[in-house]
From Swiss-Prot:
Keyword entries, A-Z: Coiled coil, Cytoplasm, Cytoskeleton
BP-aspect Gene Ontology terms: receptor localization to synapse
Transmembrane intervals: none
Coiled-coil regions listed: 276-954
Protein name (Swiss-Prot/TrEMBL): Centrosomal protein of 112 kDa
Pfam families assigned to the protein according to its UniProt record, in alphabetical order: DUF4485
Keyword field contains Ribosomal protein: no
Localisation: Cytoplasm, Cytoskeleton, Microtubule organizing center, Centrosome
Superkingdom as given in the UniProt entry: Eukaryota
Organism whose genome encodes this protein: Mus musculus
Amino acid sequence: METGSEEEKWEKLDAEFDHFVVDMKPFVLKLPHRSERQRCALWIRKLCEPSGTGAGLMGRKNRNLYAKLLLHMLRRGILEGPFTHRPEPGTLKTLPSYMSIYFDEPNQAQPKDSSPEKLPDWVRGELQTGEQRLSDSWQCSSGEDNTLVLAASDAHREQYTGKLRMRSHSVSPTYREDKQHITSKICEVHSKTSPISLDDSDIEVRLNSWNLGIENPRYLRQKPLPVSLMTPKGSLRKASSLHDDHFLSRMHEKELDMKTKMMEAKFSEEKLKLQQKHDAEVQKILERKNNELEELKILYKKKQTETEETIRKLEKKVQILIRDCQVIRETKENQITELKKICEQSTESLNNDWEKKLHNAVAEMEKDKFELQKHHTETIQELLEDTNVRLSKMEADYVVQMQSTNHMIKELEGRVQQLMGEAENSNLQRQKLTQEKLELERCYQITCNELQELKTRRNILHKEKEHLVNDYEQNVKLLKTKYDSDINLLRQEHALSTSKTSGVIEELEQNICQLKQQVQESELQRKQQVKDQENKFHMEKNHLKHTYEKKVHELQSELDKEKEDAQRKIHKFEEALKEKEEQLSRVTEVQRLQAQQADAALEEFKRQVEVNSEKVYGEMKEQMEKVEADLTRSKSLREKQSKEFLWQLEDAKQRYEQQIVELKLEHEQEKTHLLQQHSAEKDSLVRDHDREIENLEKQLRAANMEHENQIQESKKRDAQVIADMEAQVHKLREELISVNSQRKQQLIELGLLREEEKQRAAKDHETAVKKLKAESERVKMELKKTHAAETEMTLEKANSRLKQIEKEYTQKLAKSSQIIAELQTTISSLKEESSRQQLAAERRLQDVIQKFEDEKQQLIRDNDQAIKALQDELETRSHQVRSAEKKLHHKELEAQEQIMYIRQEYETKFKGLMPASLRQELEDTISSLKSQVNFLQKRASILQEELTTYQSRR
């Protein structure tokens, strides 16, 4: 019944294929290009060939799927998929599951007229060449003419051979050779029968169907009559009943032999077909599973690379923004330093201008005095000249001291800037350390991925091992069933003749049981070895994980410690800079006090000389102090603004870093969630696959759709987050531009204020000079009267005060030189400390990098060794399996030889006891059993060759 249902299915599939081929005709003829037509003809010829489509039900279904897809594409007018190139030699590959999308689409173009047309010449040529090759390869010539008329048994034989022809499309080439061998034997028995040609009737029908429809399709043909089986028992009864007619009995025995041979061939055919079906189905399931797993892996890798690229782009943007902020900060600091220099230069130039103007005014006054004092004594003139010379020297010394102090201040400011640059360099080194930490984390992720790949490889090897074990068990079961069937046949045949053979058979059964026990023991030992090796591998993997995590924790702790040390050093440097700035402010205040004291001394001297000039000088001094106070206020405001701007930048940076960290955490959570979902779906698919094979494709499609939706949602979220981050970056840039514009406006306003103050000071100076001139003219007369009395007193006081001033200036110079020396020593010590710290940090970095590289190489070596060990174990196990199979085969052969030897002995014993008819019947049965044994030996060798080829492919 099962064979009949299979034949009906085959005929339905062939009829469906015939209809597909007929429907293709108008679309192939309407193709515009000749190359496309030739390609379609080649594909149709490939589908019509039995060697290309494959054997069994699955091969025909695959062929019909190809034909349906080609017809669908021809209706659409576009050739895609596998039909863009010529067909490959060998059997057709199974269509992937995603090709079913083509069948779901509606047909856009349908043929308006399906009237039969004539084939072009090139199509006929292609198909005729294909027919000739197929007919040449499938014919079995006997070399004699049809002269004899067939008897009733020959008619049955012809029907059976016709049936074999109908089924020959789905049989493997090895089986075809066996079949041709059997038919050649039949032809030898009937020496003058007609030659049996195994030409392909299916191909003729399909090729003829290109003309006016299908002339004789499969579903209109008559089914072949089943052959009635005759057992050897019936033949024995007939032979015993028809003992008289030797001629008729011989003919009947020959017919029975032929029938038994035909039944044996049919039985072997069906067995081979079932085996090929089973192998094809198993291979298709494995290929589908592997393809689906590879597609899922490719999708996951693509999505992972896309997320990594987005993260890298965001990190690059963050780095660019940080660099822009650093550049802006450096430009602002440079502007502040330039403004400081400009202010100092302007103050120095103003001081020099005022001093020059004062010198000019004093010179004019002295000239007037000398003109008034021409009439005085020469002694007074000499004293006045001496005092003027001393004053000029003191002023020159004061100018030199001021220049030296200003130069020292500039040098100290330059050193402060250098220290700031070194601090920035330390910050850059800290950033480099953070980057290296990120690289280490990436390396850690890469190693984790490698571990996952090793896990997948281990799982694949485990699956292959299970598959090999299952194949081995199936082969053992088949061999057991064969062996049991052979033993049962031998028992039935020899139970009639003798009861002595039962003991030998029991001994053989005991040997078989022992062999089974040995095989089971070897399988148990192999399973135990596999379990032990898996436990060892898990232990080694866990140990490696623990060691690697410990090393990562140690590296992270070292990095944290180095960060804390760097922060402490930065705090120390900042405190030292603050102390130096305070010292500089103190020095500047001391210098200002000294300048004020000198100005006070000069004012006292001038008050004694000119009473009215003291008021003007005091007013000018107050104005200068106001200007200096305004300058200090503006400096403080600038410093406050710069500090506020730095605080704002730091706050923005911290916010941005927090957002990046949050995004990374969200991304990792989504990744883990997706991985968990993927693993859960995978498990459910594997479980459902064992229960329902037909529903697997639907579940996979649903899972893929859900996975794609989740990925699209994650992409949308990532896109929204990226857009938000870009908007924040844009806002920060706008804020930076606005702050820069405000700073520029403030600088312009300060410049305008400075110019206005300069103009006011010049106007005030001109008015003061005019007043001085008027007052000097008034005082001239008064000075003439009081000068003579006061000159002596003033000279004495001036000498005493000059000596005091000289002493004070010498003391101040000594103090300032000491302070400068101390500052130089502190700067040199700070430079040495910074250089030492840099060298220590570089050494630590090099040590950490070397350690990490060594550990990485060790891990790689360990992984390689483990992989090699696993490969060696697999090879040894495969060798063990092969040796066990060979041993089983040898033992089977030995058992068969023993059986044959026992048969021969018993035949020799029973030759004298048995009649001639019984002897002939036993000889015939022995010859048939020998042929069966030879056939089974051939089949075992074929199965071994297939096993070796399958293992070599794996």
